[in-house]
Amino acid sequence: MSKAMEMLLNALFPPKCAFCSVRLPIRQRICVCAECSDKLPYCRTEKRCSHCGKPAESGGMCKACLLRRNYTAGITSPFVYKERAKDAVVAFKKRDNAYRGRTLSLFVAEMVRYDFGGVDFDGVVSVPPRRSRMNEEKYDQAECLARHTARRLGLTYYPSVMRQVGDMQKQSTLSHDARFDNVRGGFAVRRPDRIKGKTLLLIDDVCTTGATLEECARVLRESGAHRVYAATIATTLL
């Protein structure tokens, strides 16, 4: 895109903060207002679990990660799922707010570099949406985020690597243990040849219990992936 065209588009559609939607100066390329930048609930300021990255009172692995088998090699998120970060994630689920993905991916990519800087990734994949959601929205926010994140990290995005199989309830309506049962066997890999022997970065919007990320990682690894790390925009508290 030419500089003149970019200026014209910015004039017609002024950038908005990805977190509070306030209008920003036309020349501002990172779409976060000064107030949100200061008040966002960053994870990096917290003591965190060494595996799932959730804020924890002490260092090392949290109890939840210790008590289960983990298929991801690690999970990271730039924000705690609350306040302005939560508002941004909820808004990002709607197609009209897909523009937020460009800015949110900046924070995700930065956190991936911070926590997994020594990892040599081969590519990026995304958690597939529930079929019922795709029928309603025709929009996949995890794919949108993954594409932007891959671009920022200089990695290849592998589209449509996974798909949902069978029926699955909405995770947010279930208890902690029920979420793991709900997703068990709920995903399959379409193209094992694309991921065989590869170290992958798996992207989703939110990490709550980690059930979806761990199940996707299990399926990816059993289909030939060498190692799977995961990243989301935000994570809930333990």
Question: What are these language model-derived features?
Answer:
Residues 1-238:
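Glycine-rich phosphate/pyrophosphate-handling loop used in enzymes and phosphotransfer proteins
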